[in-house]
């Protein structure tokens, strides 16, 4: 496998409007990120991935772009973005931007012209079907609720939208549209952007029946064309495609260097293991062996061909420690460290979502009217129409809402968690006086420094980056154990997922190994690997 510069780095995802506000308007911005670059450099990340910053009416927090060449006013100015990119370059931090290429805003000039006249050159930039106002075309439901079709009386046609009615899908069959998108990507590359996260990129091909054909070979054809015309011209560009339903075989094709499509993808099989935000949002129980099998499938499936992205969550899912760990004291930080060891010990490029490195948790006690995420708002409205009791709706929102990940970053114990001098666009989590960056940096044993150590390990340990993956005792219900092998070196990772002690038979004499990272003070014996609640080890052995 050819070694790439992005194999050993760690990416930090910034949800800009919730990260840091520099001008007191209550919304995070480029100036706020610039103020915190030294913090990110201290953490050790090699890239920052910024949430959408193109001009937008913000019905979906920037995922509805009205101008691909401008930045949204709330985020700052083009000059401030250029200053941020330059400051990152000095710190050897790559800036990645979000590209929303499946759809635009309904207020984009292309769509405003398209909806006026069937003969407009922009009409075919979107997807239309004839019908009557009373009889829409056949099709499934949109991701954010309701029909995928919306009537436009001016042209007597329906337009297609995978997400909300304010996000009409672009027609990738049109070569003129694709040319416009490629020109735009080159514009941002010329600005110094060195990474792109391609939003919902597996939705760009439609099945002809009111749905997205996420398994179409045509997607790969388009991606190869885009690669050849834009980012593929430079080895310094990192790309990751959001392909939620991708199989291992599809991921191999997307991320195999021979295919010349993408560096890697985000697949969401892990994100769906417990039923969060999938189907009707009902909880889905799972076992630790099932979790192991899922990780093993992706680790071994992309071992020789392609590359994994590693993540526990992002802006679309509840907080990591609340979902997969234990956010109650005394186990919040310890379980978060365990989850970090498990993920960062695997093969792939790790992604950290802002606040994960200090153990931010889900917010509690929200009323239905407090939720701001468009998906949560629509879910509540739809369930009310179905006759659900308010308490049941609140329970489902408390477990599933994307808003948990979008509360302001907790910098210190001051008002509004140090996020803003004004009124925050979204209320902060009320545990900010305890859980914040300032407290973490004061404590040498904190989660922040634990992440710092893991990130540094990946930069210098080839076994951690390129070693083969092998699961150990896949049926053990309490301990997730695996090894990584490269040449004469072996890494052993042991993680106890329980709030009680657990053990397994020793496979190797780890007393002769070098402990690379550990979240407890206990030591292992030759005969039995006994782990305390949420204890985690990463140990290196010479074979």
Predicted regions, residues:
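Active-site and adjacent substrate-binding regions of carbohydrate-active enzymes
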Residues: 1-543
């Amino acid at each position: 496998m050819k070694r790439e510069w992005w194999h050993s780095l760690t990416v930090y995802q910034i949800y800009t409007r919730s990260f840091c506000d520099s001008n007191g308007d209550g919304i995070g911005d480029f100036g706020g990120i610039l103020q915190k670059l030294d913090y990110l450099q201290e953490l050790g990340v090699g890239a920052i991935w910024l949430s959408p910053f193109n001009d937008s009416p913000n019905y979906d927090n920037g995922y509805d772009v009205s101008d691909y060449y401008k930045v949204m006013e709330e985020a700052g100015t083009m000059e401030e973005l250029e200053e941020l990119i330059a400051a990152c370059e000095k710190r050897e931090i790559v800036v990645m931007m979000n590209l929303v290429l499946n759809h635009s805003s309904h207020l984009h000039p292309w769509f405003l012209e398209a909806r006026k006249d069937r003969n407009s050159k922009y009409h075919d930039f979107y997807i239309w079907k004839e019908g009557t106002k009373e009889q829409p075309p056949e099709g499934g439901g949109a991701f954010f609720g309701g029909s995928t079709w919306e009537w436009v009386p001016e042209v007597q046609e329906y337009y297609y939208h995978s997400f909300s009615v304010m996000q009409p899908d672009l027609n990738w069959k049109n070569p003129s549209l694709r040319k416009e998108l490629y020109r735009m990507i080159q514009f941002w590359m010329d600005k110094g952007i060195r990474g792109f996260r391609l939003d919902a990129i597996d939705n760009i091909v439609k099945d002809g029946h009111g749905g997205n054909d996420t398994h179409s070979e045509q997607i790969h054809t388009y991606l190869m064309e885009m690669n050849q015309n834009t980012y593929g011209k430079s080895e310094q560009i990192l790309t990751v495609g959001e392909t939620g339903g991708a199989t291992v075989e599809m991921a191999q094709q997307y991320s195999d260097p021979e295919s010349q499509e993408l560096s890697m993808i985000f697949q969401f099989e892990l994100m769906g293991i417990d039923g969060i935000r999938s189907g009707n949002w009902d909880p889905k129980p799972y076992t630790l062996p099932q979790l192991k099998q899922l990780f093993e499938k992706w680790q071994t499936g992309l071992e020789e061909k392609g590359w994994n992205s590693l993540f526990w969550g992002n802006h679309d899912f509840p907080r990591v420690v609340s979902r997969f760990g234990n956010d109650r004291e005394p186990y919040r930080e310890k379980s978060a460290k365990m989850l970090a060891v498990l993920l960062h010990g695997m093969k792939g490029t790790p992604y950290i979502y802002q606040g994960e490195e200090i153990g931010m948790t889900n917010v509690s006690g929200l009323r239905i009217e407090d939720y701001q995420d468009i998906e949560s708002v629509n879910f509540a409205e739809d369930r009310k129409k179905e006759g659900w009791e308010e308490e049941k709706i609140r329970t489902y929102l408390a477990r599933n809402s994307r808003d948990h990940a979008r509360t302001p970053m907790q910098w210190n114990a001051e008002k509004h968690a140090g996020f803003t001098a004004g009124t925050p666009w979204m209320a902060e989590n009320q545990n900010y006086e305890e859980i914040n960056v300032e407290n973490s940096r004061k404590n040498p044993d904190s989660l922040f420094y634990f992440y710092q150590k893991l990130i540094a390990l990946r930069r210098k340990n080839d076994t951690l980056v390129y070693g083969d993956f092998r699961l150990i005792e896949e049926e053990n219900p309490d301990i997730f154990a695996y090894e990584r092998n490269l040449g004469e070196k072996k890494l052993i990772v042991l993680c106890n997922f329980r709030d009680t002690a657990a053990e397994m038979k020793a496979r190797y004499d780890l007393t002769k190994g070098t402990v690379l990272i550990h979240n407890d003070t206990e030591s292992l014996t030759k005969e039995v690997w006994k782990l305390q609640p949420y204890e985690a080890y990463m140990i290196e052995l010479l074979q």
